[in-house]
């Protein structure tokens, strides 16, 4: 279990480029610094649903699985040199640049149904859509 964290720490210092096979091939559940992680490769349709729900159209990211921080469940991914989480409702959190120091302090502004919801005055805007929540079913 510690090896996945060590792998992520190494990738933070080097590069996440083309690393999908080096992270995990099986589902790994761990608790680390008050957060619950499930590292695995989600189904493509699940990834598309969550990323499009947060209007994240980015081809240079690595989906790591899911994370729960303060009872908030999110899909966890690495993009633009930082860890991010996106909820089933499309709210995007920039969690931090180190797996050891993730927090919910920075939320990205989302645009839902033409109304802007301002989260911590962060100046990125994404158009969001609502989807039902099947990502966090335990049978994945």
Swiss-Prot record:
Pfam families assigned to the protein according to its UniProt record, in alphabetical order: Pox_A31
InterPro entries: Poxvirus_A31
Family indicated by similarity: Belongs to the orthopoxvirus OPG159 protein family.
Name recorded for this polypeptide: Protein OPG159
Native organism: Variola virus (isolate Human/India/Ind3/1967) (VARV)
Gene name per UniProt: OPG159
């Amino acid at each position: 279990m510690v090896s996945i964290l060590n792998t992520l720490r190494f990738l933070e210092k080097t590069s996440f480029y083309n690393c999908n096979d080096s992270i995990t091939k099986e589902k790994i559940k761990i608790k680390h610094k008050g957060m619950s992680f499930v590292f695995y490769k989600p189904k493509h349709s699940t990834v598309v649903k969550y990323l499009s729900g947060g209007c994240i159209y980015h081809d240079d990211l690595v989906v790591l699985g899911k994370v729960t921080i303060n009872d908030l469940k999110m899909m966890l991914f690495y993009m633009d040199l930082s860890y991010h989480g996106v909820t089933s409702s499309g709210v995007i959190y920039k969690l931090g640049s180190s797996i050891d120091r993730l927090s919910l302090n920075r939320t990205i502004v989302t645009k839902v149904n033409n109304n802007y919801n301002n989260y911590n005055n962060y100046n990125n805007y994404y158009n969001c859509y609502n989807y039902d929540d099947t990502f966090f079913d335990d049978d994945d």
